[in-house]
Amino acid sequence: LEIGKNDKIKSLDLFKIDIINKNEKDNKLEFKKVNNNYYLTGSQFDGSKNIKNILVNSSKSIFSNFKNLNTYIYLDIDKYFVDKKSYLSNVKGEIQLKNSKIFNSNLSAKLNKNRNFELKIVTNNNQKITKLDIEKPAPFIKNFKFIKGFKDGNLNYESFEYEGKIKSNLKIVDFKVQEVPVLAKLLTLASLQGIADLLTGEGIRFTDFEMDYESLGNTTTINEMYAIGPAISILMSGYIEKNKLVSLRGTLVPATTINRTIS
């Protein structure tokens, strides 16, 4: 291990972890340098904190502790926890780093033994393209505090990052949410109490959800967001400033309104 200025790691040949963390999870990993590449292998690791940082667009990354790391990292981890109970198994793939930042990546795993998980990152002409596919993504969705009781569904995420600006598209199909506090409050104010009760009780099922949005700095602009379901459909747009302001506008259409219009 060689440490340079600003406490950045200049060189690392071997690093082993064999501990029990505060979540009472065993962490057994080996990070080993072979020629100019690294192999990250292990039987189990608690990565719940890393997952949360990724989902909230945190700039923190374990690779930022290295100084100008240019290498390939090959992964083979038996069990990678994404929260206290859920985990990715048989995590395999590779990550290419340039200047300590992810340049390309191709990872696959099984979520809770039998659900598909795939992550691909490709960089071309200074544009980074990220694609994420998750079957039954509830363990990841639960990190967003404004959604509770998410069930079922398939998630497809794609983003394009260029010069600090990120354009993203998120799709989720055939899912149920038990509680969305902000939406439930809006429905109550609109005298749609029956739907509000569903949203805080058994939940409302949606067949399709899609959101196109752009992120720059601390501001996320939602160009269009819609959700379609048998009880209610939603169309919204607006913007969100991190830890500050939320401004959304749109239309809520209950199924009773649609039925009356058709009849």
Predicted feature descriptions by range:
Residues L1-T220, M225, G229-S263:
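Membrane-proximal interfacial segments on either side of biological membranes
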